[in-house]
From Swiss-Prot:
The keyword GTP-binding does not apply. The gene is DPB2. Present with 3110 +/- 251 molecules/cell in log phase SD medium. Phosphorylated in a cell cycle dependent manner during late G1 phase. Phosphorylation may facilitate the interaction with POL2 or the activity of DNA polymerase II. Phosphorylation is independent of DNA replication but dependent upon CDC28 in vivo. Both Ser-141 and Ser-613 are phosphorylated in vivo, but in vitro only Ser-141 is phosphorylated by CDC28. GO terms for cellular component: cytoplasm; epsilon DNA polymerase complex; nuclear replication fork; nucleus. As accessory component of the DNA polymerase epsilon complex participates in chromosomal DNA replication. It is required during synthesis of the leading and lagging DNA strands at the replication fork and binds at/or near replication origins and moves along DNA with the replication fork. It has 3'-5' proofreading exonuclease activity that correct errors arising during DNA replication. It is also involved in DNA synthesis during DNA repair. It is found in: Cytoplasm; Nucleus. It comes from Saccharomyces cerevisiae (strain ATCC 204508 / S288c) (Baker's yeast). The modification Phosphoserine is found at S122, S141, S613. This is DNA polymerase epsilon subunit B. DNA polymerase epsilon is a heterotetramer consisting of POL2, DPB2, DPB3 and DPB4. The keyword DNA-binding applies. GO terms for molecular function: DNA binding. Belongs to the DNA polymerase epsilon subunit B family. InterPro entries: DNA_pol_a/d/e_bsu (IPR007185), POLE2 (IPR016266).
Amino acid sequence: MFGSGNVLPVKIQPPLLRPLAYRVLSRKYGLSIKSDGLSALAEFVGTNIGANWRQGPATIKFLEQFAAVWKQQERGLFIDQSGVKEVIQEMKEREKVEWSHEHPIQHEENILGRTDDDENNSDDEMPIAADSSLQNVSLSSPMRQPTERDEYKQPFKPESSKALDWRDYFKVINASQQQRFSYNPHKMQFIFVPNKKQNGLGGIAGFLPDIEDKVQMFLTRYYLTNDRVMRNENFQNSDMFNPLSSMVSLQNELSNTNRQQQSSSMSITPIKNLLGRDAQNFLLLGLLNKNFKGNWSLEDPSGSVEIDISQTIPTQGHYYVPGCMVLVEGIYYSVGNKFHVTSMTLPPGERREITLETIGNLDLLGIHGISNNNFIARLDKDLKIRLHLLEKELTDHKFVILGANLFLDDLKIMTALSKILQKLNDDPPTLLIWQGSFTSVPVFASMSSRNISSSTQFKNNFDALATLLSRFDNLTENTTMIFIPGPNDLWGSMVSLGASGTLPQDPIPSAFTKKINKVCKNVVWSSNPTRIAYLSQEIVIFRDDLSGRFKRHRLEFPFNESEDVYTENDNMMSKDTDIVPIDELVKEPDQLPQKVQETRKLVKTILDQGHLSPFLDSLRPISWDLDHTLTLCPIPSTMVLCDTTSAQFDLTYNGCKVINPGSFIHNRRARYMEYVPSSKKTIQEEIYI
């Protein structure tokens, strides 16, 4: 095994370790040990702690550390063999990461660095940290008995006074670079999924998604939404809550009794459990879709059922489109196998802090550490606090977000850009975000050689922008510039011809941006969407005309339409009599402008859905293996949603700041927004052209 003489490896029978494991793992941490899990623990303890595993405290300390990691990862109650191996491997990886930062040149041995597979690879042994929570082992002397002072010695922690550099925690992450995690609904935890290219898959297999990705895409969305609903405060202590309760309220109104109302609780019922339960009231959660008959249906992992929305009363303030997750209440009739919906709403949202705490503070973006098969990086709470304090101190940092549709082939837009860049050059921002489309005409393959091709014109447009930027040295030297592609930009426009293409959209190819790369010191060609990690904040940038798509595909409810007809008839009758009630002439104090209502509806729908594109594939195609880059779980700290079909807005929902700069040119004015991350405030700016 190993050449060190401090540990004498022994073979421990699992029943001998059971009393000690039961005392630590079961009684103290409430875990249950399976026989194969106990065998794996006995094998590790015998190999790495040796013959003195009963006398010294090393075994107890290892079991306590093992249980802490197991509970932190939320692996459940039962300790099995595969879980033991994964947790032990992660404990090794954690000590490697900690050791590489704190003691990079020491080469002693830690008991977590010893495995059976290392017998012929002694050069790969992990060094032991002098501050490890497990006792150090001498290479030349037998295992010493620790003193009382050593037993209660706390692990070494870096000094909190060590200065942090904000540049180390500022990173732009494209869709292809974002780490992928799959969701296990049974264990209710995220599992790291390695990149195909890292697995050595070459050729087409490394680029095309698997059919399994297609299957898991909507299943993952459903399970994440279902778990979020069950974490809602109204579902706490039990899953018996009905957020709609329209039928019960109607019954109470008809009875007109003052006695104590009965509970209107209902459980979320799987669709398959509707069979045989005729004329009963249910609460369902599922995906809104159309079946093969062309009628509306609701789907969940257990099945699907046709729904009747002729008498549905939807909750106001949401968009209902095919592909979104909805909560519906109604009555199921076995005749026709149809579910008659009485009420419909979207699942409730959840704040970012609650979601992060639930998933164990996973570092999904890989800023504080890169995850792999054996190690899952997590956000350090103390570091998050220090980053937040540093963020508050950097009051001079600001992000400038230009409006969308920066047509570089339009002379009017180039003139406006010149004025804005001149103003920004005096006080350069930390970040300058450019959002496409960067050409007014979609770039496509030209069938004629008489005129200049559209791709050549596309490159010339960026060369002209590089010439313009070269006049502002202060800006190009001190500002990081991010370019987000639009629907008219390459390569997606070659297929979509300016229509909405597949998400996520790849960055603009480097063949068209060489001159800008030479002029600008810090430039990032990002995907759409893209994410920015800035200290303690996560910022999502998404360029899409979502408001227009929601309005085109929203579900129309016949009951609401009939009410609108009655209202119009009443208005016509009141006009004929020339008598207008005074309350119709006075605006209600809580009545909001139409634009504000539309923007709130847009933001609430996206964040409550937990997805940037809650549509069916037929309405908005998505790369199956990159659907995780569109997921908003947890919701970001700030989201830049650039939508030219919606009004310019700035609002906060569930702690998430949502900004829409709108179109760049509007009524002979060039518009942009300044975002100050230290205070999370925005300033709307405009320049007349």
